[in-house]
């Protein structure tokens, strides 16, 4: 019985702690589903697509490396 009460109190305390310490900025948890829907409608809006890529003639390394804007790499971006 004591263990059950301690577990309930612990869960309530941790739940309250999460709500107290949660980030309350504009891009918080409440806006996350809205942002994800926007990214699904417009995949180019995703932050992952905004990575820097290398232009033609720059050193890239190995074959077909994703760092080139064109997607083709043979030691330099093609």
Curated annotation (Swiss-Prot):
It holds the Pfam family Conotoxin. One of its GO terms (molecular function) is toxin activity. Keywords: Cleavage on pair of basic residues, Disulfide bond, Knottin, Secreted, Signal, Toxin. InterPro entries: Conotoxin (IPR004214). Expressed by the venom duct. The keyword Nucleotidyltransferase does not apply. Transmembrane segments: none annotated. GO terms for cellular component: extracellular region. The keyword ATP-binding does not apply. It is found in: Secreted. Disulfide bonds join 53-69, 60-73, 68-77. Residues 1-22 form the signal peptide. Residues 23-49 form a propeptide. The presence of a 'disulfide through disulfide knot' structurally defines this protein as a knottin. The cysteine framework is VI/VII (C-C-CC-C-C). Belongs to the conotoxin O1 superfamily. This is Conotoxin 5.
């Amino acid at each position: 019985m004591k263990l059950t009460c301690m577990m309930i109190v612990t869960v309530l305390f941790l739940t309250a702690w999460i709500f107290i310490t949660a980030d309350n900025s504009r891009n918080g948890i409440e806006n996350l589903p809205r942002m994800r829907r926007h990214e699904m409608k417009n995949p180019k809006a995703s932050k992952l697509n905004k990575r820097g890529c290398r232009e033609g003639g720059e050193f890239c390394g190995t074959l077909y490396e994703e760092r080139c804007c064109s997607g083709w790499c043979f030691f330099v971006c093609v």
